[in-house]
Every structure is written in C-alpha cells, then in structure tokens.
Amino acid sequence: MIREYFRLHQTIATIVARSQEHIEIAKSAIIDSRTQLEEFIAFDPLFQLTLVPYDLPVDNAPPIVKRMCHASSLFHVGPMAAVAGAIAAFAVEAMVEAGADYAVVDNGGDIAIFSDEPLLVGIYAGSSPIKNLALEIHPTGGILGVCSSSGTIGPSISFGCADVATVISRDPAIADAGATALGNAVTPDASLKECFSVVDRDEVIGALIIRGDEMAVWGEVPPIRRARVKYDLITKG
C-alpha cells in the first residue's frame, strides 16, 4: 500500500492507494477542486465567510460549490463546513473512476474511503482519557465518509466543546457538514444523547461524540475496537 502526504494551500491530505497512478489522480482531483473553489470565492467572497446556508446566485456554479451548499443546508451551517469532506470525496471518486479498488483520502480528519478490505480508522480525541479506539470499517461497497469536528483540537471553527464529534455518511461532504453541526451542539452541560438530534437525517448512517471522559454513539456506527492508534499518522499541518 502506498501512503503519500499532499499539501496544497489549506488542504493537508494523506492519500492511500495500491498504485502511484491512483495517488497522482487524487492529487489532480484535489488541485482541480481547489481551483474551482478559489475561483468561485474570488467571484463571491461571502461564500467563504458565511456561517449559515448559502443560496447560490448562479446556476453554473462548479460542482464542488453545489455539493458544499447542499451538504451544509441539511444542517444549517455555512458551506465551508463541508469543504474538506467535499475535496476528499472528489479525489476518491476520481480514483475509483480510474479503477482503484482501494482509495482513502484523509483531508485533515475528514476522510473519504473506498475499500475492498477491512481497515481501521483511529478516533483521536485530544486530551480526553478515551484513547486507542478505532472504527472497524468493513468493505464499503461504495464511497463512505467518516468526518470529525472538535472544539478542543485543531484550527477549524467549532462553537462546541466536543473533543471529537464524528459523523458517517455515504457522502463525505454531508459527513463533514454534519460533524460540524454535531460538534457545535456539544456544550458543557448538553446531554450527548440529545445532541444527536441535529444529525438525525436519512443521509447520516451514524455518529459518535467524545467529551472528556464521556462517549456516546448513535445510529449504525461501525464496530469500535481497541487499537494502537498511530498518532504520528494523523493528517495535520
């Protein structure tokens, strides 16, 4: 298996595939997606700044912009809440179209997966005492998004205090926007069980929250197992 780190402006990704050809295809897809996105932001800077769903002013917006707008509208967050998952999704879709049977793009903790074999996705919750756990992902039969948000780790905007809020969806852009919304819902006094109401949609397969020494799951979450999580493999800047 080939694992390659790839950075382009704010996009910091780890790409995993069985062939270098598919790695290069993923890089090209990331470059194309970012180029389209940056050109649209230059046309309408509000798209990058708004924290609420965005109504497209034009019909010919690029596919990544339309996808981000749709995903974010489901959870009442801004479109940039879906950017990492959308970029990862387009990259894995391009790999699969080129014949890849194993394709993973981890875009800063927002992961798009297409796999014909089981794999583990580590759960990183920062300073929480809940450590060394992973989701056991079985052959996906399609692309799967496993995306996370945190109010205590990393530079992304979150209005909550979850150490990690993870959402699983068939569309990584939807998983990303959902993770942002779920993370925002986790306040110090909130019932974790009640927080899941913000992602209770048909498009969401399951979700997980860790806050301090508490963990809660909702929906059809893959098996959680003990694992020696290799924190040096976490995609970060």
Swiss-Prot record:
<comment type="similarity">
    <text>Belongs to the UPF0280 family.</text>
</comment>
<dbReference type="InterPro" id="IPR003374">
    <property type="entry name" value="ApbE-like_sf"/>
</dbReference>
<dbReference type="InterPro" id="IPR007183">
    <property type="entry name" value="UPF0280"/>
</dbReference>
<protein>
    <recommendedName>
        <fullName>UPF0280 protein Mthe_1297</fullName>
    </recommendedName>
</protein>
<dbReference type="InterPro" id="IPR037456">
    <property type="entry name" value="MA1715-like"/>
</dbReference>
